[in-house]
């Protein structure tokens, strides 16, 4: 309801397959409740684009539903298989979504290594694609690498886990 401004998502394929808007199947309407300027997310995505770092597209919108004004929103491209296909050579890789915010309770998506039991990761992350394969080994491997590598091994092996040039661009921008 307009008095309780909530973020929401439009899924063009929810009821009819193969619908899209500008080749996007989903759009996220973010209420920016923690950003009174409404600028942080948009500026970060624009800076990322300017630095050739893959990032979702973002625009501003005044949103009306059935003639009623609902508010001002950031409209953001969904990070999904379509996004991966557009921005990466190997789009068949897994895409994980972090669950709870860092530090929120005992199941925070904190990139800590919790061993090899997938169940310990399923309460912190969700697999957003390749659900049939249900292969969590890459997430388990990267958390093990981050938390248990020696400094020398970390430096020597970083490029196997991360696209270092893109990562450095992101950190600089």
Functional labels for PLM-detected ranges:
Residues 18-19, 37:
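Short active-site-adjacent helix-start/loop capping segments
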Residues 33-53:
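A conserved alpha-helical element in kinase catalytic cores
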Residues 21-22, 40:
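Short, conserved acidic/polar surface loops in the N-terminal third of protein domains
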């Amino acid at each position: 309801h307009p008095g309780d401004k909530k973020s929401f998502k439009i899924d063009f394929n929810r009821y009819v397959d193969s619908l899209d808007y500008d080749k996007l199947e989903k759009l996220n309407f973010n209420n920016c409740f923690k950003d009174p300027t409404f600028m942080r997310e948009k500026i970060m995505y624009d800076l990322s684009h300017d630095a050739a770092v893959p990032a979702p597209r973002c625009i501003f919108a005044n949103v009306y539903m059935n003639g009623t004004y609902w508010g001002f929103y950031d409209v953001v491209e969904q990070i999904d298989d379509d996004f991966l296909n557009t921005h990466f050579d190997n789009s068949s890789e897994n895409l994980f979504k972090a669950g709870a915010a860092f530090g929120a309770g005992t199941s925070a998506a904190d990139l800590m290594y919790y061993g090899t039991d997938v169940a310990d990761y399923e309460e912190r992350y969700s697999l957003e694609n390749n659900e049939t394969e249900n292969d969590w080994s890459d997430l388990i491997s990267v958390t093990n690498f981050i938390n248990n590598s020696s400094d020398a091994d970390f430096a020597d092996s970083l490029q196997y886990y991360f696209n270092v040039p893109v990562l450095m661009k992101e950190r600089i921008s």
